[in-house]
Amino acid sequence: ITNDSQILQNAEKLINWMLESIEPNGTVMPYMELETKKFSQSNDVWYKQKGCLHIKTCIPLLQLYKISKKENLIQTAEQICDNFKLFQNNDGSFMIHGDTKIINLHTQSYAIEGLLFAYSVTKKQDYLTSCQKALNWCMSNIENDGSIPLWFNFKDKSKAIYPIAQIIRLMILTDKILNSNQY
């Protein structure tokens, strides 16, 4: 993080644009329609819908808050993070979208990453607890070959390396925060 005024001005400009995408309840509209200049969502593809993955958007807000101390940034970040309750199942997994049973390991790792970073700044225990529940769910789904499926409750059946690497990194960070060897 820097004190370079030009970089900070650009960061604020980008953050202000992002803030326009955040609804009053903290959900994030995923993209802007260029013709109308309005943020929107679409059922065309999974990443054009509101979802657990957008919890990660709290990170740049909190990073700028740490420099600027502007309260609206931490308040908005907490609004975004508090939406974990809309997406997290009782078993700890995160639904990709609030209106489905589909779970995607990659988007779940985004939610965990956002909540873990938010915990490091806010010390809100429910963020850390949510991360632990999600990581425990991941551990319970490790298959005999050491993998975890990318999708659950979805037509596609595949496995991928990148979310496993993310989950391992998040387990290590969580252990560091907890000063434990749980994961």
What are these model-derived regions, one by one?
Residues 1-183:
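Glycan-recognition and catalytic cores of secretory/periplasmic carbohydrate-active enzymes
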